[in-house]
Regions:
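Domain-scale recognition of functional cores that engage charged ligands
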Residues: 74-97, 108-231
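Low-complexity, highly charged intrinsically disordered N-terminal segments
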Residues: 2-90
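Polar low-complexity intrinsically disordered regions
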Residues: 1-2, 165
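Conserved phosphate/anionic-ligand binding catalytic regions in large, soluble enzymes, centered on
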Residues: 102-108
């Protein structure tokens, strides 16, 4: 297989039909592929990024029309559930891990750290409260952090030594190149190259669980369920 970097400078007119379409795609995505590969990002993540990049440049928005959304009209009352369901739930706790999506910064609230570190009550942050809840239920707590939230969030969890005796406290989501809106090319910021990258969003959890080894680690230790929510 020819690496896409070798295709730069090749005249697409030598190809026809589907070949030319493929060639155009390879040329337009090559700057992203090369940048991500140089950063050591795994192939499965690069392929996922390119999949959605191709949708972007083809005009797809990813939006769901409001007319296609139907509101929930009735929610079951947990107090009405039969007792055997509660017993099943209690037994399942020993096979359940809590994963909190913790990649976002609180810049809009004046915080240059993870939003979960914002103090909310009596000096406790959201993450403090989450850690207390995890300790009370005796379930492992894992954070999906971004490269911007990892260090500060783990420093806070050091206050809770009883968390996760046999599992890591976090795994990292990937990073992806920012895209210019005017020409769909990677953003260039030589003065601060870190500003050329951004987190890919919550949907990266599926890829990050695999590439970080977290999914394999959870399965090896007998966990079957994950409760996933924002931090």
């Amino acid at each position: 297989m020819i690496h896409v970097s070798t295709l730069m400078g090749v005249d697409p007119r030598i190809f026809t039909g589907n070949e030319q379409k493929l060639m155009n795609v390879l040329i337009s995505t090559a700057p992203f592929v090369n940048r991500m590969a140089a950063a050591g990002l795994p192939t499965i993540f690069i392929e996922t990024f390119i999949h959605y990049y191709e949708q972007l440049v083809s005009g797809q928005t990813g939006y769901i029309a409001e007319d296609d959304i139907r509101p929930v009209t009735q929610i079951p009352d947990v107090e009405t559930f039969p007792q055997h369901l509660a017993e099943i739930g209690q037994r399942s706790l020993s096979k359940t891990a809590v994963i909190k999506l913790n990649g976002g910064l609180g810049t809009s609230m004046g915080l240059e750290q993870a939003k979960s570190l914002l103090p909310v009550k009596e000096g406790y942050s959201f993450l403090d409260i989450i850690a207390h809840q995890a300790q009370l239920t005796n379930v492992p707590l894992l954070l999906m952090n971004s490269f911007s939230t990892e260090e500060d969030s783990l420093a806070l969890l050091d206050r809770y030594p009883n968390l996760n005796k046999d599992l890591p406290h976090s795994f990292l989501q990937h990073k992806e190149p920012k895209i210019r809106q005017d020409n769909w090319q990677p953003v260039e910021w030589p003065e601060n190259p870190e500003l050329e990258w951004c987190p890919p969003g919550h949907g990266d959890i599926y890829t990050a669980l695999v590439t970080s080894g977290t999914l394999e680690g959870l399965l090896q230790k007998g966990y079957e369920y994950a409760f996933v929510s924002n931090a």
